[in-house]
Amino acid sequence: MTEHAHSVTGIDIHPGATIGKYFFIDHGTGIVIGETTIIGEHVKIYQGVTLGGLSTQGGQKLKGAKRHPTIGDNVTIYSGASILGGETIIEDNVVVGGNTFITNSVEKDTRVTAKKQELQYKNN
């Protein structure tokens, strides 16, 4: 059923995710919400948002582990944002700007935006 909904809407919400009242998705294409994600009430998210897990070292226990973020109440997450990791908590009344990449918790009543992008090259 989940795969059918994903193919029709472009939204991938794992059936194990916990979602509060008055959850709103605008322009849902590309949204991914992982299995252990917890979303509070009155949360709005836009296209291309990922609430996902961080990569793990080989052999780490994953079953039953909290791998995805917790989102508080009255949070807005704009397009292209990625919020990753089971220890990442976005507290209440936070606005997450577009194209941000978050792997640490964000305190309540905060606005998060991306700085001017710069290319970083890795020498092989």
Model-derived features: where do they sit?
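Extended hydrophobic/aromatic segments used for targeting, binding, or gating
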Residues: 55-66
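Terminal amphipathic alpha-helical/low-complexity segments used for targeting or macromolecular assembly
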Residues: 1-9, 124
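Left-handed beta-helix
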Residues: 9, 14-15, 20-21, 26-35, ...
